[in-house]
Amino acid sequence: MRQFNLSGKHAVVTGGCSGIGNSIARTFIENKAYVHILDLDENQGQSVIESLGSDKASFHFCDVRDQAKVHNVFQSIAKDHPVDILVNNAGIANIGKVENTTEDDLDHVYAVNIKGVYNCLHACISIMKSNGGGVILNMASIAASAGLPDRFAYSMSKGAVVSMTLSVAQDYLGDNIRCNSISPARIHTPFVDGFISKNYPGKEKEMFEELSKTQPIGRMGKPEEVASLALFLCSDEAAFITGVDYPIDGGFTTLNT
């Protein structure tokens, strides 16, 4: 029997057009799942679906900050398909200490990274319950447990994601719903390149090397490596695992001294 076989499963991946979310979507498809990608970029979304295959994936425009629209998207999916897997991957970053994090900064991070996850959970749980169960995977960060400099709002938001993971795992044990989270360190994606360019203009190469070295293993992670862990946690091989946050961090949280 093939391990990590998601044949017949329908997975929802938020933020699935690029980076980690896109790698997760591709990995799930390679392992026979059908993937519903939720994202904000319609043009990119259609391009992604063309590359994945319209018989293997579909794109749904969705702003995870808007609860009513999130519910509408999930209900439209659930009319024809079960939601077996939810990957809450959509998120944004923010640089700043508490004193230079504005109220608008905090509200924006909250709206996407916390309320966005809540909205998708809120829309999905009842669907999974009616279908006899499911698997939820939330994308957290090492920022939830390590004191990263200049990441006040972001760290707060990812700490909330880990807390939501534990609450959902506990509350829905009796409904056959598993819930875990992944906490990556720095993963090399186009988002990271853009983030460095925006915040460290003229110092891109220097900052990339500096950020890479913060992982004791000596490099940033690859989206495909996160996707492989996501595949395991969402597969039947992980049926005995719930309420756990998994660091994938090149030794960041345990080997940095």
Please provide the spans of the model-predicted regions.
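Substrate-binding pocket helix/loop in short-chain dehydrogenase/reductase
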Residues: K97-V98, T102-Y110, L211
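Short C-terminal tail/terminal secondary-structure segment
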Residues: R2, A146, L231, T242-T257
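Conserved glycine-rich cofactor-binding loop
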Residues: H10, C17-S18
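Active-site loop-to-helix junction immediately N-terminal to the catalytic Tyr of the SDR YXXXK motif
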Residues: T101, G147-S155, S167, F195
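Residue(s) in the substrate-gating loop at a strand-loop-helix junction
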Residues: S141
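Alpha-helical segment proximal to the catalytic Tyr-Lys
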Residues: S126, Q170-G174, A239
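Active-site helix of classical SDR
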Residues: L121, S157, T165
